[in-house]
Amino acid sequence: MRHYEVMVILDPDLEERAVSPLIENFLSVVREGNGKVEKVDTWGRRRLSYEIKKKPEGIYSVIDLQAEPAVVKELDRQMNLNESVLRTKVLRPETH
């Protein structure tokens, strides 16, 4: 398994209480693929440096996880299919 960091920017029109269940829904893909979610850090509403899908701000969330590459690819695919997700970025942090 590899370590990944996933940043997701959600639609600012979502209610605060709807953010956590939405992220948990995405993370079920990781858990079903025998991956491990290490940390979920929701930063809240932040102003974007440029508009994405005509939205000037978004709800940022950073997820640290360990999973196989195919599981992370499926997670990214599921997130991109959801209309509440403005942008995703999957990174593999460097380990020294």
From Swiss-Prot:
Cross-referenced InterPro entries: Ribosomal_bS6 (IPR000529), Ribosomal_bS6_CS (IPR020815), Ribosomal_bS6_sf (IPR035980), Ribosomal_S6_plastid/chlpt (IPR020814), Transl_elong_EF1B/ribsomal_bS6 (IPR014717)
GO molecular function: small ribosomal subunit rRNA binding; structural constituent of ribosome
Single GO biological process annotation from the record: translation
Domain of life: Bacteria
Signal peptide: none
Keyword terms: Ribonucleoprotein, Ribosomal protein, RNA-binding, rRNA-binding
GO cellular component: cytoplasm; ribonucleoprotein complex; ribosome
Family membership noted in the UniProt record: Belongs to the bacterial ribosomal protein bS6 family.
Described function: Binds together with bS18 to 16S ribosomal RNA.
Protein name, UniProt field: Small ribosomal subunit protein bS6
Gene name of this polypeptide: rpsF
